């Protein structure tokens, strides 16, 4: 990754910029990390950066802060699962997970049962492990309540995919 690339250079002026994701290692003085988990979440956290983006695509009645918080809260379960997967080394594959398949247009919510079903489909050899992990994820969700915590654990791509689904219902 970025740390290895920076390590190839003997010049201390060479820096790398990368996502924090769920990295808990010792930071390098030559690595700059984005606030929160990734560049997308850093921009989403900033009212001045998110507001113009929000107003370009969203046509509903709610304000940007209300929608941002709703999305973060709805994604909390998935975000906690991703976090625990990274920290505990569970090896769960999330590639191919679809917000569209988990999105319920009537309520504009994410159906967690549909997320779990997709995770099982993407990881057929981990079925029993997933059942146990789901309980741990529920416990982890209790700890991550405030806006800063939600911004720190949420993946930007999940947020943007969910935002796209919400916007698609407000354009109708």
Where do the model's predicted regions map?
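Acidic, divalent-metal-binding catalytic cores of TOPRIM
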Residues: 1-172
């Amino acid at each position: 990754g970025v740390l290895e690339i920076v390590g190839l250079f003997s010049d201390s002026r060479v820096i790398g910029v990368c996502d924090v994701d769920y990295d808990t290692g010792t930071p390098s003085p030559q690595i700059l990390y984005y606030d929160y988990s990734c560049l997308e979440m850093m921009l989403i956290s900033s009212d001045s950066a998110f507001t113009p983006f929000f107003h370009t695509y969203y046509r509903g009645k709610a304000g940007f802060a209300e929608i941002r918080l709703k999305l973060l809260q709805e994604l909390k379960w998935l975000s906690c699962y991703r976090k625990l997967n990274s920290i505990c080394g569970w090896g769960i594959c999330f590639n191919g997970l679809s917000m569209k398949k988990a999105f319920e247009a009537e309520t504009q919510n994410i159906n967690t049962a549909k997320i779990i079903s997709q995770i099982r489909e993407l990881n057929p050899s981990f079925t029993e492990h997933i059942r146990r992990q789901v309980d741990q994820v529920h416990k982890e969700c209790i700890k991550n309540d405030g806006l800063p915590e939600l911004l720190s654990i949420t993946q930007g791509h999940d947020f943007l995919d969910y935002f796209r689904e919400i916007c698609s219902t407000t354009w109708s």
